[in-house]
């Protein structure tokens, strides 16, 4: 997942915890 608005796979669930803008993903 790249953001809280776009949840994807559980493998990327750790990314959902933070805004995509801060991770620059």
From Swiss-Prot:
Gene Ontology CC annotation, any one: extracellular region
CC cofactor: Ca(2+)
GO annotation, biological process: acute-phase response
PTM annotation, UniProt: Glycosylated.
Comment on bound cofactor: Binds 2 calcium ions per subunit.
Keywords: Acute phase, Calcium, Metal-binding, Secreted
Domain Pentraxin (PTX), chain residue ranges per copy: 1-25
Transmembrane annotation, as ranges: none
Single annotated GO MF: metal ion binding
InterPro entries referenced in this protein's UniProt entry, alphabetically: Pentraxin-related
Localization in the cell: Secreted
UniProt record similarity statement: Belongs to the pentraxin family.
Known role: Displays several functions associated with host defense: it promotes agglutination, bacterial capsular swelling, phagocytosis, and complement fixation through its calcium-dependent binding to phosphorylcholine.
Subunit comment: Heteropentamer. Discoid arrangement of 5 non-covalently bound subunits 1, 2, 3 and 4.
Protein known as: C-reactive protein P2 subunit 4
Lineage: Eukaryota, Metazoa, Chordata, Craniata, Vertebrata
């Amino acid at each position: 997942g790249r953001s809280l608005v776009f949840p994807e796979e559980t493998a990327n669930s750790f990314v959902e915890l933070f805004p995509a803008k801060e991770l620059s993903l």
